[in-house]
Amino acid sequence: MKETIQADWIKSEAFNLENCCNDNPLNILGPHFVNGQWITRVWMPEADEVNIIFKDKTYKTTTLNHKWLFEVTLPEDPKNNYQINVSRGGVSHSQQDPWAYRKEWMGELDRHLFAEGNHHHIWEKMGAHIHEETNQQGVMFCIWAPNAKSISIIGDINSWDGRHHPMQKRLGGIWELFMPIMKEGDAYKYEIRTQEGHIYEKADPYGFLHEIRPQNGSIVSKLNNFDWEDSSWITNRDSSSQINKPISVYEMHLGSWMHDSIENKYIEKNGQTRSPVPAADLKPGTRFLTYPELTEKLIPYVKERGFTHIELMPISEHPFDGSWGYQVTGWYAPTSRYGTPNEFKEFINRCHAEGIGVILDWVPGHFPKDKHGLAFFDGCHLYEHGDPRIGEHKEWGTLIFNYSRNEVRNFLVANLIYWFEEFHIDGIRVDAVASMLYRDYLRPEGEWIPNENGGNENLEAVKFLQQANHVLFQHFPGALSIAEESTTWPMVTEPTNVGGLGFNLKWNMGWMHDMLDYFEIDPWFRQFHQNSVTFSITYNYTENFMLALSHDEVVHGKSHLLHKMPGDDWKKFANTRALLTYMWTHPGKKTIFMGMEFGQRQEWNVWDDLQWELLEFEPHKGIRNLVDDLNKLYKNEPSLWKNDFDPYGFQWIDCNDTSNSVISFMRRENESNEWLVIVANFTPNFHGSYKIGVPLEGFYKEIFNSDGSKYGGSNKGNMGGKETLKYNIHNYENALEIVLPPLSVSIFKHQLKQ
């Protein structure tokens, strides 16, 4: 009777293995002590013959109740000290048995922290890890999928057949399997069978490397095998707050900054030629630059321009170029389009060596519906809300994370820490924060659900953002956390302990819209819109603002910055120079998008590259020279950055000269009264004798003039500077009588008496 029950049980287990319905393969496979004997069972689909090699002796197996379930009796506990010799179609090979390794990978504390959302290094457990288990090298796989019926590892190792390597389900919805037959570089996916019997092939949410599109599998990759050389940079960064330092950011998209001919192959250090990754069909015959090529070309370029940071549009793995990187499927992997994770680390390493920080765009607000991604991951709404009124952005065609679920928040918060810890990034910019904060964002009435208080705030998203920023600054006090938040949500840059969201910078979207609207107006009509220029100061000190002219403003028919400007070419260039100079003198940190630094004419196109040929023309060289000198001046003059978030550092001289569209103001660093005086003329009219009041008598040196010939201007100026006059104006007893060039901004610095 017992033998019949045992046979029926084995037959049932084998049936489940064959049909990918077994969540406990260790219950039947591997070594087992049965009725006083050591029985070893091996599951080997499509095998003709299987033998066990133990202590240099070969033991022939037999099949019991199923043609692919092989069994043998061994004289003692073999543990994992045996090999399987497999014959298929006359070809044989030997391998280790994955089910001989029974030790749990995720410990009790790991599971506990993950379940409560506080495992800040969960990537060290989840995913695929090259690992040595009892003197055997292999790969440990670990994935969270609590609703799955069964999960298998599929890849080249088993011809992508899910019947071969079922995983073991552990507590907390964790699945594990140690694969001694896999190694670095092997492609894989998880084949997930749902409770309803549907099968999904999923990339690894925690994968460190993924295949190049259009393929979408994950690749086993080592993580901690890079020798960093930036310890002094990191120590200095984290020793003090970065927002009290000059920050001038070059925002860019790595894949469209510059291309190369597909005929020019990239030669690796070992002499091997790397297969090129075609950029797109827009420019047939072009390819992306690799991370090493970007290291050699981009970093010197950014350093020469004088920017303090590079901001990279999302480089996490994404399947569709046209998403610009904002529809992420590989959260823990830099995209393979440009190379390997270690090559990206070397890019950052070299940035730090050249004094350049690296900011990544981070997208925790939504994710795409691609079948290999997070959507409906284990047959249920695991990462997203089940109700589309909360869990879907219909206008974007994407899904929204379920921030109320601890494990989902853990996935995201740990991902944030991962990029800082493993890749040494210096900051993040969180995209589309408003879409996270409001339940009714881009939703008509009736297509959203109020929160528990009846409001439209997404309280779970607020809690998540606060947690993410709190944990980030605990680990990395010198980090930058920048919010792209387009509404008037309060306290975005206030600490979480006083109820703020915890960012330390926020893009000033109001300033950006006002300034672009203003500069698009014919200069004659600007006198009626002076408030667009001056209004930003009224709210400037409510948040820690960053002034940004970003990629969003040079796409979708909006024109690039130069071609937003009215008038002929001369006026377009003069307006552009004036706007950029005003931006650099206005309180707030700075960000401009690639191409603006030399007057790109065409709209940005993700499938194209920048119009580098324009630098053959003097006006475009002039814009580039202007940006170079603005960055140099900015870093050398603490008055332009030290009190960005303190009203002490700014004072109007005159903001009411609407008839001339002229504004004047002062910036200062400290009690020394070493004021910088800035005067902006936003019309093409030349003023040969324009008076402004100043607080101190003496000589004011003209230290910058956007109309200089070096920048492509008319070279009208003040012959190096001006002495003050005794003249009462603007509530001051001293005045400067200055020349105001057309469409220009001039900067003067009071010279202290020796």
UniProtKB/Swiss-Prot annotation:
Molecular function via GO: 1,4-alpha-glucan branching enzyme activity; cation binding; hydrolase activity, hydrolyzing O-glycosyl compounds
Record-stated family: Belongs to the glycosyl hydrolase 13 family. GlgB subfamily.
Enzyme Commission code(s) on record: 2.4.1.18
Alphabetized NCBIfam families for the sequence: branching_enzym, PRK05402.1, PRK12313.1
Gene3D superfamilies: Glycosidases, Golgi alpha-mannosidase II, Immunoglobulins
GO BP terms: glycogen biosynthetic process
Active site: 431, 484
SUPFAM superfamilies, sorted: (Trans)glycosidases, E set domains, Glycosyl hydrolase domain
Protein name as it appears in the record: 1,4-alpha-glucan branching enzyme GlgB
Superkingdom per UniProt: Bacteria
GO cellular component: cytosol
Job of this protein: Catalyzes the formation of the alpha-1,6-glucosidic linkages in glycogen by scission of a 1,4-alpha-linked oligosaccharide from growing alpha-1,4-glucan chains and the subsequent attachment of the oligosaccharide to the alpha-1,6 position.
Coiled-coil parts of chain: none
TM annotation in the entry: none
Keyword Transferase applies: yes
Subunit structure of this chain's protein: Monomer.
